[in-house]
Amino acid sequence: MEQQPRKMNAFDWVLIFSTLALAVLFVISGILPNLPLFQATIFGQDIPLFMLSVWAWLFLFWIITNVKRMTGVRFTRSNKIALLVALSVLLLYYAYSLMTRQFIYYWDYVLYYRMQVGISKSFHADGFFNGIIDVIKSVWYNSYSLLNNVFLAAPYTFVPRTPNLFVAISAASILPSLYFLIAMFIKVVERFIQPKHGSLFFIGGMTLAVGFPLIHRALLFGQPDLLGLIFVFLIILLTISYDFSKTDFLRYFLLIVLIIMTCASRRWYMFWLVAYFVCYGVYVILQAILKKRWSDVKRTVLFTLATGLTLAVVFLPMIIVVLRAHYSVSYSAYNVSGFSGELKSQAQYLGIGLLAVILTGTVYGIVKSKTRALTIFALIDVFFTIFIFTRIQNMGYHHTLILVPAYLLLMLICFGGICRLEKRWMLALSSTVVLGFCGVNAAVCATSSAESLPSPFSNVALIPPQRTDIQQIRAVNRWILEHCSKGESAYIIPHGYPYNPDVFRSCDYPDFSVSKHVPYGSAVLGTHYFPDDLLLAKYVLTCEPFCNLSLAEKYNTAFLSEIPQKHFTQVAQFDMGNGYIFYVYERILPMDREEIQFYQDTFAQESKQFPELFSVVWDELIKELK
């Protein structure tokens, strides 16, 4: 049913005036960047950045309220209680997990935290105008944009700047909005299924969503990519019952804005956008053609053109970067098994139990005419998304967030079928089996840190590996700080688990002292440059047994060879207390042509494949010799 035009309300005016105020501040900061206002802070946070973050949440809440009105969703008292209980359970679990863990965030797990610290410093040092420009550039040119950090800046203002509290604030900020939208999604799906027991369906749906481990894995490990899922569910809610039979400019505006926000959140959400809108567009146009509603086709085409033109303008620099890059080559180290292997991985992520629920929902959804189109849409969306994603790389836990809506929909259809049962004993038995298993599955994942869980359960351990070597890592760090002066570095070759350079860099955050002396490291073929610190660092560290990733072991073998070792002497070693021993080598002779030539010969094949990552580095080193 088409929504009627509405009058402006107080929320609309607040958003309009706050947007105008920020726009004025942006212009003034470009002209007069040194005004005291742009240097003011609140609890150490730059006030203009704080204001931008508050505005971002205000804008998001405005979108959510409009989407709720447009979908016509109404929550009963029992629905609200179920939602409140679900959020309470989740937030309590996150708090427990964060308070009991012994974990060092590293690599992608700590990157958003570093970016959060960085965006605060950037806005304070460079001003509001340049800070916003940096955010825009990060969307255009970086794999990780600062959009998520803009949203998290205001909540993060009032807590100590530690990685654990960054995760806590991310959860407290994102989960309420996300699960409110999931609750709306359940109510919309309920209209399609028309269960006989609506209250049970909602409670069961919330149970399935709360206990779905794939939703929580990334955030619990420090990656707030879950924010993008808010935009995804908003897009689904705006399109799931809309067929372009009537013009709705507000809906078009919201969709275009949400598509932009989804792309800006994380670049790989574009795979979901492509798959979803291809499926959606084909469905809408086919329906219109079959019913001979040519005006619907016209509206669909015009919306597509307007959206495409807007995205082309907004993301033109990003489009150029993507077209020039050869991601299938540079990300080849992450493409380990292709499409078929990814299907197997997804089955393992889900586990036999949840996979059975999804398959049951698929069969039931196809059999029932009311849910047939929705079920087929979800299936095609899943397989199409996986197919185009694996043209570049395979999916990690965080990437799998883009499949969560389809998985959840198929589980809801399964449970919706149960809620249509008329015999009470069958209803009680079936719902107990499905929800009982999902609860057990969630509990197993929530209490496990194992790399591999039994096949009936989701292979998604939610407890990070508990470290027993933090004091030993700190001892290595203290040694590095004592022996490295300003400008000197210690290069750590291992690049796997449990040891890699980032483990040492991140161990004492928010103290960044060690990061000034320990480089990020290099190992991934096609992505990382040749580690020139093998020839420039004052110290080089390696370990036994070795922790490998991609080229790391080859770098280690090369370093321990005769020619490089002529330039080093071992000066220290550290027993990490878990079977690993670290050895520290000090450079006693400066690099020379023989050493450079040795690495050139050893990595000739890699340089031939990626000259910009190897030969260019060696050329610069040779220039330094001259």
Question: Positions of the model-derived regions?
Answer:
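Membrane-proximal, lumen/periplasm-facing interface regions of secretory-pathway glyco-
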Residues: T432-E482, G496-D502
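Loop-to-helix entry region of an early transmembrane alpha helix in multi-pass inner-membrane enzymes
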Residues: N142-F180, A218, G222
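Short acidic/glycine- and proline-prone juxtamembrane loop motifs at membrane-interface regions
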Residues: R217-L227, G396-Y397
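Membrane-proximal lumenal/periplasmic loop motifs of glycosylation machinery
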Residues: M99-V110, F123-V150, A171, S345-Y349
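C-terminal luminal/periplasmic domains and tails of membrane-associated envelope-modifying transferases
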Residues: L462-I492, Y497, S506-K626
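Start-transfer (signal-anchor) and selected internal transmembrane alpha helices
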Residues: M1-A95, S199-F202, K298-T307
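Transmembrane-lumen/periplasm boundary regions of multi-pass, lipid-linked membrane glycan transferases
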Residues: Y112, G118-S122, L273-Y283, Q287-T371, ...
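Transmembrane-helix motifs of polytopic, lipid-linked glycan transferases
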Residues: N66, L165-P195, L234, G361-I366
